[in-house]
């Protein structure tokens, strides 16, 4: 079994948005699976999949663990940009508050 790489793609910097939102957090989303395919240029054993549902993830894993097990497997998991935990939201608020304080005099 070769490696399976998972890239969790939420389309941006969700953590940074929770700390301090701004236009600098809007980024161009890359075609990560296309990038992997470009790197191996058809000359290596490589399997890529872009999944958006649990069913698609199951299918990709079955391929990665089955017929593509001898390949480098790259699975991009697309999640909603606002898919975040309550704990992350609370942490972001605390960091944002700390960032807005004046500097500590030395």
From Swiss-Prot:
Record family assignment? Belongs to the TPP enzyme family.
Alphabetized PANTHER family for the sequence: PYRUVATE DECARBOXYLASE, PYRUVATE DECARBOXYLASE 2
Return the SUPFAM superfamilies for the record: Thiamin diphosphate-binding fold (THDP-binding)
The induction field says: By hypoxic stress.
Tell me which cofactor or cofactors this protein depends on.
a metal cation; thiamine diphosphate
> What species is given as this protein's source?
Zea mays (Maize)
Q: What EC number(s) does this enzyme carry?
A: 4.1.1.1
Q: Which UniProt keywords apply?
A: Decarboxylase, Lyase, Magnesium, Metal-binding, Stress response, Thiamine pyrophosphate
How does the annotation summarize its subunit structure?
Answer: Homotetramer.
Give me the reactions it catalyses: a 2-oxocarboxylate + H(+) = an aldehyde + CO2
Sorted alphabetically, which InterPro entries does this protein's record hold?
PDC/IPDC-like, THDP-binding
The protein's GO terms of the molecular function aspect are:
metal ion binding; pyruvate decarboxylase activity
Please identify the protein, giving its name as recorded: Pyruvate decarboxylase 2
Q: Which cysteines are joined by disulfide bonds?
A: none
The cofactor note reads: Binds 1 metal ion per subunit. Binds 1 thiamine pyrophosphate per subunit.
In this chain, Mg(2+) is annotated as bound at 10, 12
């Amino acid at each position: 079994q070769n490696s399976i790489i998972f890239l969790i793609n939420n389309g941006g910097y969700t953590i940074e948005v929770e700390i301090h939102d701004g236009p600098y957090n809007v980024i161009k989303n890359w075609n990560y699976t296309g990038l992997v395919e470009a790197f191996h240029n058809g000359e290596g054993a490589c399997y890529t999949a872009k999944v958006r549902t649990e069913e698609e993830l199951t299918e990709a894993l079955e391929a990665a663990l089955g017929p593509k097990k001898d390949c480098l497997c790259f699975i991009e998991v697309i999640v909603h940009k606002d898919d975040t935990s309550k704990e992350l939201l609370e942490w972001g608020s605390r960091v944002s508050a700390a960032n807005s304080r004046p500097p500590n005099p030395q």
